[in-house]
């Protein structure tokens, strides 16, 4: 389960502003490691996962088709797309952004989720963890409660959950609360330190 780095828009609006407008660096990126190609990691996900495992990949509309195609080419079976309803809107040039895609794959044989009555629209408020100055630790942080829904549906107690792009550790916190073992990987040392502190 992961929220990999992908191309983001500056989300400019009709007034010329944008969520990430002031955070884009000289390379035109919002984050230091913004443009990791999914063809580099999708085959590795498939290699390390057990047969029957579920795989959740979060993305936006810009990268949806590419990620879907690459994961299928890597051997995954696409089950369906889920929607994360953030319960808040971000002003854009056209329609306001309120949701993100969660692509739901499996490796090998089909295994049902644990709670078959779960809706494919997951309404979880988009809250950010902030530092002492009120600044977001991570601008694309995913809520722990959202991760708990996915983990609870696709694993049992003491199973191992992998998040290769763990950011500031929401998946790890969810695993801790649900009695799952967790393997988290993060290349950005600032985020890695924050994740360790949050999971301590």
Where are these regions (language model features)?
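Class I S-adenosyl-L-methionine
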Residues: 1, 6, 10-24, 70-200
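Conserved Class I SAM-dependent methyltransferase catalytic core
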Residues: 30-87
């Amino acid at each position: 389960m992961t929220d990999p780095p992908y191309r983001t828009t500056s989300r400019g609006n009709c007034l010329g502003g944008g969520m990430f407008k002031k955070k884009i660096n000289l390379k035109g990126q919002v984050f230091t490691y913004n443009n990791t190609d999914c063809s580099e990691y999708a085959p590795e996900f498939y290699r390390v996962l057990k047969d029957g495992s579920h795989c959740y990949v979060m993305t936006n509309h810009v990268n949806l088709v590419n990620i879907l195609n690459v994961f299928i080419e890597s051997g995954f079976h696409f089950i369906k797309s889920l929607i994360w309803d953030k319960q808040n809107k971000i002003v854009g040039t056209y329609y306001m952004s309120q949701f993100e895609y969660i692509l739901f794959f499996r490796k090998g044989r089909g295994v049902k989720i644990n709670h078959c009555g779960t809706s494919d629209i997951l309404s979880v408020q988009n809250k950010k963890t902030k530092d002492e100055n009120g600044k977001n630790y991570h601008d694309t942080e995913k809520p722990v409660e959202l991760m708990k829904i996915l983990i609870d549906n696709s694993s049992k107690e003491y199973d191992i959950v992998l998040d290769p792009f763990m950011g500031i550790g929401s998946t790890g916190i969810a695993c801790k609360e649900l009695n799952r073992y967790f393997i988290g990987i993060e290349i950005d040392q600032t985020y890695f330190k924050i994740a360790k502190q949050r999971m301590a």
